[in-house]
Curated annotation (Swiss-Prot):
It comes from the Bacteria. Signal peptide: none annotated. One of its GO terms (biological process) is protein unfolding. InterPro entries: AAA+_ATPase (IPR003593), ATP-dep_Clp_protease_ClpX (IPR050052), ATPase_AAA_core (IPR003959), Clp_ATPase_C (IPR019489), HslU (IPR004491), P-loop_NTPase (IPR027417). ATPase subunit of a proteasome-like degradation complex; this subunit has chaperone activity. The binding of ATP and its subsequent hydrolysis by HslU are essential for unfolding of protein substrates subsequently hydrolyzed by HslV. HslU recognizes the N-terminal part of its protein substrates and unfolds these before they are guided to HslV for hydrolysis. This is ATP-dependent protease ATPase subunit HslU. The gene is hslU. GO terms for molecular function: ATP binding; ATP hydrolysis activity; peptidase activity; proteasome-activating activity. Keywords: ATP-binding, Chaperone, Cytoplasm, Nucleotide-binding. It holds the Pfam family AAA_2. GO terms for cellular component: HslUV protease complex. It comes from Vibrio parahaemolyticus serotype O3:K6 (strain RIMD 2210633). Belongs to the ClpX chaperone family. HslU subfamily.
Length: 443
């Protein structure tokens, strides 16, 4: 779990996302509150529930990007889902409880990787011994007991040194390794994923643990044996318990496109993929117990962050009970021409950096001038204003159109240099931007 302060979290988000300070502050505080809660005494910790967040803002302003970056910063079980993928319990489609099952799978995988990392050094030592045994089988007496001889020990040390220096990497040896589990792949009907997982687990258990002789290069054998030895050192039951504890106390669920499950107008009949899904989300967000293949998971202290553009629907169109369970509202602002200019240059691995690096692979140099970047930003903003406003995503469309000719001819123009200035942008995009009908279809 991340121990970063809210200021550090915002600073890290600023490296990738331009603007939206209110949203960054809200998620930073929510993330820090997870850590604060874990410092409390048990009796008080149980009473502190997370303050769930609803992010409201037009498309392409950074809602989903905040979620993606938060996942990397959180160092906690995190899952992002689309609200439109679910249907009400009892109908064909995914039930909302699969969110918690998937989150638990993420936590188990994450905890497993951490546990394997902790025992990595011991596992590599044991793998090294097994490889040395294969290279230098120990001498045995007439009773079958291993004999300890001085010269054998010295030879073993020489081989150990060579092994560590990588001199034996390409030598092939024959070793016993655990046979890969041949899992039976079963296509799950919608809503029956849990039953399918249980069936697959049953088929895998029938195979049991079998050893198989394989001829491998020493560097590949080292990797395979280290993984096998690490798996022996990890207690799977303790690992599952730790993963469930991590989900229950640090888990974060990001629900995107929540505005798409609002009820629109007066309609008769069951609304299984809209209001029905909202009703099913209520117990998850409020706190309930979900059965997973790893054990029972309580959702009382899982943090839920929902987001939506709310261009057609309004937050008040959500059912009142769900509105009450998302107490923190954050509005994200539409992006300006100046924001677009900053997006093109300031973030780590910005769009301009990406195109420069891509063309560099063909030995073509690209240089974006200040006035060229300003013109690109203005072009994207103008098209957004005159047609549909799709936010920063418009920059991808404009940049692709701008770089189209250079990208196509780059392989034949090795060593060339192109300067993308205002005049170049105007020449490539000017007519398209000024003609509203053209920009509607091309940009």
């Amino acid at each position: 779990m991340s121990e970063m302060t809210p200021r550090e979290i915002v600073h890290e988000l600023n490296r990738h996302i331009i603007g939206q300070d209110k949203a960054k502050r809200s998620v930073a505080i929510a993330l820090r509150n997870r850590w604060r809660r874990m410092q409390l005494e048990e009796s008080l910790r149980v009473e502190v529930t997370p303050k769930n967040i609803l992010m409201i803002g037009p498309t392409g302003v950074g809602k989903t990007e905040i979620a993606r970056r938060l996942a990397k910063l959180a160092n906690a079980p995190f899952i992002k889902v689309e609200a439109t993928k679910f249907t009400e319990v009892g109908y064909v489609g995914k039930e909302v409880e699969t969110i918690i099952r998937d989150l638990t799978d993420v936590a188990v995988k994450m905890t497993h990787q951490q546990a394997m990392e902790k025992v990595k050094f011991r596992a590599e030592e044991q793998a090294e011994e097994r490889i040395l045994d294969a290279l230098l089988p120990p001498a045995r007496d007439s009773w079958g007991q291993v004999e300890q001889k001085e010269d054998t020990s010295n030879t073993r040390q020489i081989f150990r040194k060579k092994l560590r220096e990588g001199q034996l990497d390409d030598k092939e040896i024959e070793i016993d390794v655990a046979a890969p589990q041949m899992g039976v792949e079963i296509m799950a009907p919608p809503g029956m994923e849990e039953m399918t997982n249980q069936l697959q687990g049953m088929f895998q258990n029938l195979a049991g643990d079998t050893k198989k002789k394989r001829k491998l290069k020493i560097k590949d054998a080292m990797k395979a044996l280290a993984e096998e030895e690490a798996a022996k050192l990890v207690n799977q039951e303790e690992l599952k318990e730790a993963a469930i504890f991590n989900v229950e106390n640090n888990g974060i669920v990001f629900i995107d496109e929540i505005d798409k499950i609002c009820k629109r107008g007066e309609s008769s009949g069951p609304d299984v993929s809209r209001e029905g899904v909202q009703r099913d989300l209520l117990p998850l967000i409020e706190g309930s117990t979900v059965s997973t293949k790893h054990g029972m998971v309580k959702t009382d202290h899982i943090l839920f962050v929902a987001s939506g553009a709310f261009q057609v629907a309004k937050p008040s169109d959500l059912i009142p009970e769900l509105q009450g369970r998302l107490p923190i509202r954050v509005e994200l602002e539409a992006l300006s021409s100046n924001d677009f200019k900053r997006i093109l240059t300031e973030p780590k691995a910005s769009l301009t950096e990406q195109y420069i690096a891509l063309m560099k692979t063909e030995d073509v140099d690209i240089e974006f001038t200040e006035d060229g970047i300003t013109r690109i930003a203005e072009a994207a903003w103008t098209v957004n204003e005159t047609t549909e406003n799709i936010g920063a995503r418009r920059l991808h469309t404009v940049m692709e159109r701008l770089m189209d000719e250079i990208s196509y001819d780059a392989a034949e123009q090795s060593g060339a240099k192109f300067v993308i200035d205002a005049a170049y942008v105007q020449a490539r995009l000017g007519d398209t931007i000024e003609d509203e009908d053209l920009s509607r279809f091309i940009l």
